[in-house]
Structure formats: structure tokens, C-alpha cells
Curated annotation (Swiss-Prot):
This is Photosystem I reaction center subunit XII. The chain crosses the membrane at residues 7-27. It holds the Pfam family PsaM. Keywords: Chloroplast, Membrane, Photosynthesis, Photosystem I, Plastid, Thylakoid, Transmembrane, Transmembrane helix. Its main location: plastid. Belongs to the PsaM family. GO terms for biological process: photosynthesis. GO terms for cellular component: chloroplast thylakoid membrane; photosystem I. It is found in: Plastid, Chloroplast thylakoid membrane. It is a single-pass membrane protein. It comes from Cyanidium caldarium (Red alga). InterPro entries: PSI_PsaM, PSI_PsaM_sf. SUPFAM superfamilies: Subunit XII of photosystem I reaction centre, PsaM. It comes from the Eukaryota.
Amino acid sequence: MITDSQVFIGLVIALVPAILAFKLGLSLYE
């Protein structure tokens, strides 16, 4: 059974690298 905390941790693990890559892309684009 998957708990809410496991879902939240999974989302964080998935989103953090994407956000960092997005910010890095913006900084390189400027």
C-alpha cells in the first residue's frame, strides 16, 4: 500500500531535478 508521504516524496524526487534543470536552462539562455 502506498502512503501519502511516499507519493509526496516521489513527486519531490521527480520535480526537483526538473526545476533545477529549468532554472539552469534559463540562466544559460540569458
